[in-house]
Structure formats: structure tokens, C-alpha cells
Design a protein with these regions (language model features):
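HhH-family (HhH-GPD) DNA N-glycosylase catalytic core used in base-excision repair
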Residues: 1-179
């Protein structure tokens, strides 16, 4: 129950602009993926592959450059290799691993789906405190528990879970001073 309360508390601190930004965050990401690549799936796959520990603006820039040049670069080496495989024609779902990355991919491909991307910010929001680099790993059990908390909170707030995650992410970034 505490997870739901923490998520709801962050949502309640959202400005109108942050709510609007969050509501349209994944549809905008979908449009970016469609614009930078031959298919939305390929674009979303490269964006998702490069996403771990990557600021959003840099992530988009690197994905855009990767498709323009045919060469992925700039991220963690294993993630760059996954992005390159997708650029070279691999199915993103055959390449991408981990609940966070695969869900992020799915949310970009289908911004109105039911997946919740539980990244380090979503985790911190749910537990009610910033962990920096000291947070425990997000294994399958924790991922499922936190995803369920976002789904339940979203039901109470009248928004889709993917929208709630994006809205709270937008608020959290402002509150912790991340652009």
C-alpha cells in the first residue's frame, strides 16, 4: 500500500504542464521512433537498447545518429551491440533483454498499452526516496510488485498506468534536478 501512496503523492505534485507532458510522453517517443528508423519497431528497439543509464535527449540523439550513419555508438558497449544488431535488421524482441528495456520498447511501440516501465526513477518514486546509485537491483519479483503498484495507483487516479509512470517521471526529474 505504501508504494501506491508514494506514487500517488508524486502524481499529486504534478503541475498541469507536467501532466500534459506525461500524457503525451510515450506518443511523442513513438513519433520519434517512427521518424528516425525504417519502422517504429526498429526505432523503438534502438532507443530502448541504448536507454539504460542514458539521459533521454542523448538517447534520442544517439539513436537518430545511429540510423543516419548505420553505426550505433555512445552507450554502454553491450547496449551499443544490441542497437547495432537492430540497425542491421535483427528483430528487437530477439535482441532486447530485461523487463525494463523490453517494457520501455513496448511502451514506445504501443503508447496505449498496459506495460509500466520500472526504471530507477519509477523505483525511487514508489519507495519515496532517491537512491542515486545505491538502490538494490530490480529483479523480476520487484519489477512485478512495482508494476502492479503503478497499475493500482493509475486505476485510482483515472489515468493509464503508462501515463502515470510518465507523469510521475516528469515530476520526479524536476524535483531531483534532472533535465
Amino acid at each position: 500500500m505504501e508504494l501506491i501512496e508514494n506514487i500517488t503523492a508524486v502524481f499529486d505534485r504534478a503541475t498541469q504542464d507536467e501532466i500534459e507532458d506525461g500524457l503525451f510522453w510515450y506518443p511523442r517517443a513513438h513519433q520519434i521512433a517512427r521518424e528516425i528508423a525504417p519502422t517504429v519497431e526498429a526505432g523503438a528497439g534502438v532507443i530502448a537498447a541504448l536507454s539504460p543509464m542514458m539521459p533521454w535527449d542523448r538517447n534520442v540523439m544517439l539513436a537518430r545518429e545511429a540510423f543516419a550513419t548505420g553505426v550505433a555508438q555512445g552507450g554502454l558497449s553491450k547496449n551499443v551491440a544490441k542497437a547495432q544488431a537492430i540497425i542491421d535488421g535483427a528483430d528487437p524482441l530477439d535482441v532486447l533483454g530485461g523487463d525494463k528495456v523490453r517494457t520501455f520498447y513496448g511502451n514506445i511501440v504501443n503508447p496505449w498499452g498496459d506495460g509500466v516501465t520500472i526504471d530507477r526513477h519509477a523505483y525511487d518514486i514508489a519507495v519515496g526516496k532517491r537512491h542515486g546509485n545505491t538502490r538494490p537491483g530490480i529483479g523480476k519479483k520487484v519489477y512485478r510488485e512495482f508494476s502492479t503498484a503503478y497499475i493500482q495507483a493509475a486505476l485510482g487516479l483515472g489515468v493509464f498506468p503508462v501515463e502515470l509512470q510518465a507523469i510521475t517521471w516528469t515530476v520526479w526529474r524536476r524535483e531531483i534536478g534532472v533535465n
